[in-house]
Structures are given as structure tokens and as C-alpha cells.
Amino acid sequence: SATLGTTTVTKTSDETTDTVKGIFPTPRPVVTGDYVFSSKLSGTPGLGFPEGTSFGYQWQRDGKNIAGATAAEYDLTASDVGHDLRLRVRASLAGYTTDYTYAKAVEVQPLHFTATPEPTIDGILRVGGRLTSVPGDWQPTAAFTYVWYRNGKAIKAATKAGYTLTSSDLGKAITVRVRATLPGYQAVSRLSPPSVKVQSGLTSASAKLSD
């Protein structure tokens, strides 16, 4: 007779070890400074991060990264005015899951002109006379646009600093609206006092129109 032998096979499963990464606290970054054009903002990650944590910074405008704005400090520009700005902080450390936290988004405000004088009109108040708008001494210096008015109604195509009176202006009062702009500043419009009524016939007399 034959005896059949038996073979014992022992299988050992592969041992796997899952490493659980640490999780950072998630405090909001802290930003100091005024959200006003030309101001400097400074950001810090907030408290509670483990020793040795490294941080990366990214400033965002309306939720989109601002090119090159990757330092803890940021100087506000004219492009930021009227938009929401926030700081994103990236925290990284060996053994931890990389984390992103965000400061509260805040709308950036413009600066304001410190002097906004009422414009005046120089020129000859007769049909055919040439009028010139004098914006005055704005601070800081601004760029100006103009609209001329006849009895309170805008004159078509009269949008330059100078205006030549026509027969349509006869017997009417003339005013000019000056709009001042400067990047990063709130635009301001000022209206001149109305002139006396325009007379007929060009003469050599001239007058400065003001209050």
C-alpha cells in the first residue's frame, strides 16, 4: 500500500502600516493695516501651529491670486480699489497634511482728494466768444474731464476744457462740470456757478466768471 504524505503550507499576510498624518489647527490668518489705497498690509498665520511649521503666503483679489504677491506684507495698489482682498496662508510640516487658511476678505477703499475747489469760467460772454474752464488747485494733482451746460442741459460734444459760444447760447446761462480722477482716489465732480446770460455780438471785453 502507498502512503500519501501531506504538506502544510502557512501563508502570512503582508503587514501594512497606515501612517496617520497630523492635522493643523485652522485659525484665521491675522492681517494688520488699513484696507485703503497705498497702505501696507502685514499678515501672520495665527496661533497654535506646531514648532517648525513653515508658511507660504498668497494675497488674493476677488478670490484670485495676485501675481508676485507672495510675501507676508503687501502694498495696496490702485488696482485693488473697489475689490475684495484677502490673504491665504499655506502651512506645511513633515508628518502633517498641508493646510490652507484664509483671512476675511475686505473691500479696499480709495483715498480722497484733500482740496476740491469749485471750477470757474474765463472768457467772453458773447456769441462767438471763447470760454475756458479753470478747474482750480486740486490736491493732489488730478486729471480732468469736462462737460459744458446750457441752462442746465448738457451741450452735445462740448467736452473739452474750452468752449466757443454759438447762437444757440444766446440769452442762456453757461456752466461747466469738471470731473477729477486720479488712480487710487475717489473721483469727484464739481459744477461751476452759472454765468450771466450770453449776449449777442462779439466784443473785445472779457470777464472772469466766479462766485
Locate the predicted segments by residue.
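Ser/Thr/Pro/Gly-rich low-complexity disordered regions
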Residues: 1-211
